[in-house]
Amino acid sequence: MVSNSSPTSSRFSSLRSMLQKRWPAALLMLGLILFPFIFGRITGSPVTEGAPKFWQGQLIVVFIFAVYAMSYDLLIGYTGILTFGHAAFFGGGAYAMALFLTHVAPDFTDAYDIVIGGLEITGVVMLIIGTLLSLITAILLGLLFSAVSVRVKGHYFAMITLAMAEAVNILSKATDFVEWTGADEGLHGVPVPMWINPTQNRLTFYYIALVFAVLMYLFARRVVDSPTGKIFVAIRENESRVRMIGYNPAAYRTAAFVVSSVIAGLAGGLYSLWTVSATPTMTGVGTTIDALLMTLMGGIGTLTGPMLGAAVLEIFGHFFYQWFGARWPLVFGLIFIALVIFLPYGIVGTWRLRSDQWKRAWQRFRKPREAAAD
């Protein structure tokens, strides 16, 4: 029997199927791309001033912390590794970028820079080198943490990672390196090229942060959907079985740490450019707790869940601070408890598990009402 379907119709059907699955993501991307202009139109303010500029800044923070939380999910959600030292990767990347631009990179202010097509070429090169240093620093820290995970597991490992992260935090505050790191005060006024300056060219920074978030998500998605990602999940479910079928769990845990640390370190490097600073707070346990909260709110083992959790924490945190002042963490804590009770798998995780059940319940609810209306 000969099939009547042509290759062209097959391609169109596969494209249609892909669009049906991906249209929410495409719509979200379109909305984020147009957001500065739409919001400027609504408020009647220029895109580079007032409320549009402020909310660009809020979303920049969301993009960066969405990537950071997603990197944490690769460990706790996909590989089953609970760590309290994730801030070391984020802060390490931030300090690597800030230290290089402040103390090592040549002066790339207007007087010394080469400008071609509106881009400061020296500044671009320095940013690339700083990014590579953030990446290398994150890899080294990831290898260090993974070396410990070979010998210690479970809650003991979580406590050791907390101690290791605290060591990084103490190092960042050490007065022995005050001329380099600023000790408790941190580094401030990190030189940033004019074309990416978050104050004077925030719209450019907004789109760079958006592209960064998309690329990091695609990279993480590629990893978790790959055979290596399947081994990550298998280690989470039953490490002994993974070892029995011939795989080396230690090697895959190391890979998970390196991938996670690289993503977190790059997010930290971008955050140092956004804040034009690097401070001990970035390496503190509070920054790790932020990633944990974002992941739990959005849904462990989902990638998109932690990104949504970052948006909820940052945006609602802003409004709660406006409404409740210094008491906003208490209010947010109560809401978080309610989320854990009613959405035990996080927003995205619970939706994936129970959306069909909720849809069927809604249909059963609508049928009697529609029949009565007829």
Please report, for each region that a protein language model flagged, where it lies by residue.
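Transmembrane alpha-helices and adjacent helix-loop boundaries
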Residues: V2-D374
